[in-house]
A protein has these predicted regions:
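Conserved, mostly hydrophobic/aromatic
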Residues: 33, 146, 272, 387, ...
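Carbohydrate-binding surface patches
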Residues: 33, 216-218, 226, 632-676
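Short Pro-Gly-centered flexible turn/kink motifs
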Residues: 33, 98-100, 267-286, 726-734
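Active-site neighborhood of glycoside hydrolase catalytic domains
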Residues: 377-379, 411-413, 417-579, 589, ...
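Aromatic-lined carbohydrate-binding/catalytic grooves of carbohydrate-active enzymes
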Residues: 307-449, 458, 463
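C-terminal beta-sandwich/jelly-roll accessory domains of carbohydrate-active enzymes
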Residues: 659-736
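Glycine-rich, aromatic-flanked loop segments that form ligand/cofactor-binding clefts
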Residues: 78-100, 226-240, 283-305, 343-350, ...
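Polysaccharide-binding surfaces and accessory modules of carbohydrate-active proteins
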Residues: 25-38, 45-247, 263, 679-695
Length: 736
């Protein structure tokens, strides 16, 4: 599929080569710089052969003359002893084994990708698995998923049903993954793969990226490096529970499996039914971790992310400014304030609704999406009129999947909530929150109607902040049959996706943020329907350096809502100077999470200047290529990254000091991604120093900057009474 490149990369062959049968029918699934080769010989076992740097036709021919057969391309349970499996089932007659052979394959050219579909059939049962690969024509991403079809007389039970499997040749292989918790999301962890099984999984039920992320990277040449070395990245594109397994047994290969977490999710596949797993996206690069990140960022912006080609507005969100203390005059003042600083959008957060139960705190009224006329006498219409007057767009907060026991919705429809039979409800936020059962089509209709009614009445609304503040903690569906209770986790997310599809079909231009108690929905399963996600409820700038660093492994800056917040910070109570808070926020989708009236004139002027400067670099940050330079996790006292424009004519360099000691020594940081032949003029943005930096306005070759970097002062050159233990820099590089 696709054209073969002419170069042969022997290290890559050594990386993942598995010899093929001499009579094999090898098929190459290729992207611009990578190849995945499988053996789909009709009547034989489906075999994996190779994944790595792109192969030429001659290399493919060499593989075909190989020798012994390779690893299974999709291992199944039953006849291979203790080996791990991607698929295990129980047939209608109780047989728990599978023996699959290739029945055939098809290749289809889509607009921007090639698709290979290899159909497998059990030797004794009319049970089918189609293993699918989509290779993109212009970005180094290959998606893999499976379609499982039951042609048997009765239902077949699926007990393990992974989307993808990839064997990785043993060696000095390291795995990078993200873990965390509420307000501490996307923390980076790196481990060498050793004998045993390493599992990354999430069982939250509604969200899936607080305690772990469904994405991993494998560094094949030892401990991960940012811009050198061979790396494989994998991301499951799913909004629900998942499990990623890296199994190291007594074979020569690490075995990587990715799929829906089977925990309490046994699935009864009816006669004639096809179960389609979520896709897992793979990328390979020999340009290190950042190389894989750039591949995922380009793929995401081009093919997955809603409005991935559209610049994001600079906004003010009301939450940390007023919390539940919503009132008409206060909202109008915040609109005026963000407009005066150059902002483009105002978002009214929680606290604006409720009739019988007033949303003055977090323990009531979810589901009762009517305006609290005491707080907002002129309703949403009045706020929209004020936004138009101020010249800003207007957005609003919703939590459509949730309710409270103290709500009119719950009083009317207690049968709509996720609830275990014969058990008392386990309640969430505020001691009253419950989750609506999206497995129920009536609930799907209701959740859709929340957005539909809002947008029908107020079509001028530009932005919705969609929140989700509870996990599934009452495992039980009042809609599903007793025999299908194990389907709840899966059916919830099928229902969720159906709702999102309906919303996007009717409101394709609406901007929607995925907020889920902060960063609970940072995944490629929801982003086809959402424009961005809230990285974390923790807006502390220092902690955001760490969280946004980890998040950037798989998600571009355009997806990361990054806001300037208060000092002391409302989560850590750390006092960080405004410049540092701005410089961190400018590395993502810039916004504000603050009450502007607490800012003095000097601070407002600094925000106004920073917003104006961000507008000039917005295309570079939101659409540029990331190069991570110095990790905060290495504890060198500094973190640094940069974004480079597609034509390498502009770049933005970020430098944040992460700790301060007297007479400390910080590393000088070489840049990356520049054109070595071009000369770049340096301009500092968000400058507060009394005098310009020594290199301000000067030009350096890209080669010099990538070999040497620049000597960054350890502190800001400001008056004595303004000095503190923080320092940060944002530099604009423009080719002459």
């Amino acid at each position: 599929m696709g054209k073969y490149s002419k170069r042969l990369v022997l290290p890559a062959l050594a990386m993942m080569l598995l010899s093929a049968n001499a009579n094999a029918e090898n098929i190459s699934v290729s992207t611009p710089n990578t190849s995945l080769v499988v053996d789909a010989t009709k009547g034989g076992a489906f075999k994996f052969v190779y994944y790595g740097d792109k192969l030429s036709a001659a290399d493919i021919a060499t593989l075909q003359a190989g020798g012994t057969a390779g690893k299974d391309a999709y291992p199944v349970y039953g006849l291979s002893g203790a080996s791990e499996a991607a698929l295990s089932v129980r047939h209608f007659d109780g047989n728990m084994t599978l023996q699959m052979d290739v029945e055939g394959y098809t290749e289809v050219q889509e607009k921007n990708a090639h698709v290979l579909r290899v159909k497998l059939k059990d030797r004794q049962y009319p049970f089918y698995v189609t293993v699918c690969y989509r290779a993109y024509n212009d970005v180094d991403i290959i998606e893999m998923w499976t379609e499982i079809n039951n042609g048997e007389k009765q239902a077949v039970t699926l007990s393990q049903f992974d989307s993808a499997y990839l064997p990785i040749r043993r060696g000095n292989v390291w795995m990078s993954h993200l873990y965390g918790s509420w307000a501490n999301e996307a923390q980076l962890s790196e481990e060498e793969l050793k004998p045993g099984t390493f599992v990354v999984e999430n069982r939250d039920g509604t969200r899936n990226s607080h305690t772990s992320h469904g994405e991993v990277m494998f560094s094949l040449d030892g401990k991960a490096q940012e811009n050198t070395g061979r790396v494989i990245g994998a991301a499951i594109c799913y909004s629900g529970n998942y499990k990623l397994r890296a199994v190291t047994d007594d074979s020569e290969y690490h075995q990587f499996f990715a799929g829906i977490d089977e925990y309490n999710s046994e699935y009864h596949l009816q006669k004639g039914e096809t179960f389609t797993t979520p896709a897992t996206a793979f990328s390979y690069s020999h340009d290190g971790l950042s190389g894989v990140s750039r591949n995922f960022h380009r793929w995401g912006r081009e093919y997955k992310l809603m409005h991935g080609d559209r610049e994001r507005k600079i906004l003010l969100n009301s939450w940390e400014g007023v919390y539940f203390d919503i009132n008409e005059a206060g909202m109008a003042q915040m609109m005026a304030d963000i407009k005066s600083m150059g902002g483009e959008l105002f978002v009214m957060d929680d606290g604006w609704f409720g009739d019988k139960y007033k949303r003055d705190t977090d323990n009531c009224a979810l589901g009762d999406w009517v305006v609290d006329r005491k707080k907002l006498p002129h309703g949403i219409d009045g706020l929209l009129a004020e936004a138009k007057k101020q010249g800003v767009k207007f957005g609003i907060w919703l939590e459509p999947e949730m309710s409270n026991t103290t709500s009119e919705l719950y009083e009317k429809h207690p049968d709509w909530v996720v609830k275990a039979p014969k058990r008392d409800l386990q309640l969430g936020r505020g001691g009253t929150q419950v989750v609506l059962d999206l497995a129920n089509p009536k609930v799907q209709d209701f959740v859709f109607s929340i957005v539909d009614d809002m947008m029908t009445k107020y079509p001028e609304i530009d932005y919705i902040k969609w929140d989700a503040n509870m996990n599934i903690s009452n495992h039980g569906s009042q809609y599903l049959t007793a025999n299908n209770q194990s389907h709840l986790y899966i059916e919830y997310h099928r229902g969720f996706e159906k709702v999102l599809q309906r919303i996007r079909a009717k409101y394709p231009d609406l901007t929607i943020q995925a907020c889920a108690s902060g960063g609970g929905r940072a995944n490629w399963g929801v982003l086809p329907y959402f424009d961005e996600f809230w990285v974390s409820d923790n807006t502390d700038a220092l902690q955001r350096v760490y969280m946004q660093w980890g998040t950037s492994y798989f998600f571009p800056a355009i997806t990361m809502a990054s806001h300037i917040s208060n000092a002391p910070n409302h989560q850590t109570f750390r006092t960080i100077p405004l410049k540092y808070r701005i410089d961190v926020a400018m590395s993502g989708r810039l916004g504000m999470e603050i009450q502007p009236k607490i800012l003095n004139d000097e601070e407002k002027a600094l925000c106004r200047k920073a917003i104006a400067e961000y507008k000039t670099i917005r295309p570079i940050v939101q659409f540029g290529d990331i190069y991570r330079l110095q990790s905060p996790y290495e504890k060198k006292g500094v973190a640094s990254l940069m974004y480079v424009g597609e034509k390498k004519d502009k770049a933005v360099f970020y430098w944040w000091k992460t700790e301060t000691f007297v007479n400390q020594h910080l590393p000088r940081i070489p840049m990356a991604g520049l054109d070595p032949q071009k000369r770049y003029r340096i301009t500092e943005l968000d400058r507060i120093d009394n005098e310009p930096l020594s290199f301000e306005g000067k030009s350096f070759s890209g080669e010099y900057l990538m070999q040497n970097g620049l000597e960054i002062p350890y502190k800001q050159n400001v008056d004595y009474h303004k000095q503190n233990d923080w320092a940060s820099r944002v530099l604009l590089l423009e080719a002459e």
